[in-house]
A protein has these predicted regions:
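Conserved non-cysteine loop/helix-boundary elements of the Radical SAM core domain that shape
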Residues: 1-61, 67-86
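Terminal RNA-binding accessory module
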Residues: 77-177
Length: 177
């Protein structure tokens, strides 16, 4: 219902089928999305449907935003504006849920070997910072921090065994394969 109010053509059922198809055809596919909470007219029940959908799909990466009124948009003058406090609570609930999902997704990679492109050296930790195919260069995805006994060239691609994870990042060491 909220999607329809936002003039989105997709339905929850269509998206569920699409994500299932993607995961069936490409098991290592990374599912990422952004969601908005507090759109005018969004009820607690509708919010809980969104939360349950996120729990079900288990997105690898998720960004959440609170609706904010912008002049010259259809939503600006819609009735039943959601209170700031309700939007903040919903945002926090989604982000807490996604933190748990992301942490568990990260833990599932421990022991795996990933190809990582090296972007920089973090001088504070003396770890290289990079990304694999699963990490987009934006504000939603994290990094892979790579320990190496040898100096690595920026832009090089190395094999990295994942040793641990936190909510957004993976940590590992260079291996020769």
């Amino acid at each position: 219902e909220v999607l329809a109010n936002m003039n989105r053509r997709d339905t929850k059922e269509n998206m569920r089928e699409l994500f299932a198809y993607i995961k069936k055809e490409i098991p290592d596919a990374i599912l990422r999305t952004t969601v908005i909470v507090g759109y005018p007219g969004e009820t607690r029940k509708q919010f809980l449907e969104l939360r349950d959908f996120i729990k079900e799909i288990k997105f690898d990466r998720l960004g959440c935003f609170m609706y904010s009124k912008e002049e010259d948009t259809v939503a600006y003058s819609l009735p039943n504006q959601v209170t700031k406090k309700a939007k903040e609570n919903r945002y926090n609930e989604i982000m807490a849920l996604q933190s748990d999902i992301s942490y568990n997704q990260g833990l599932s990679h421990v022991g795996e070997i990933h190809k990582v492109i090296i972007e920089e050296l973090d001088f504070e930790t003396n770890l290289y910072v990079g990304r694999s195919y699963a990490f987009a260069p934006d504000d939603i995805d994290g990094y892979i921090f790579v320990d190496s006994k040898e100096d690595l060239e920026l832009g090089s691609i190395v094999s990295c065994q994942i040793d641990k994870a936190d909510i957004y990042n993976l940590y590992g060491h260079v291996v020769n394969v």
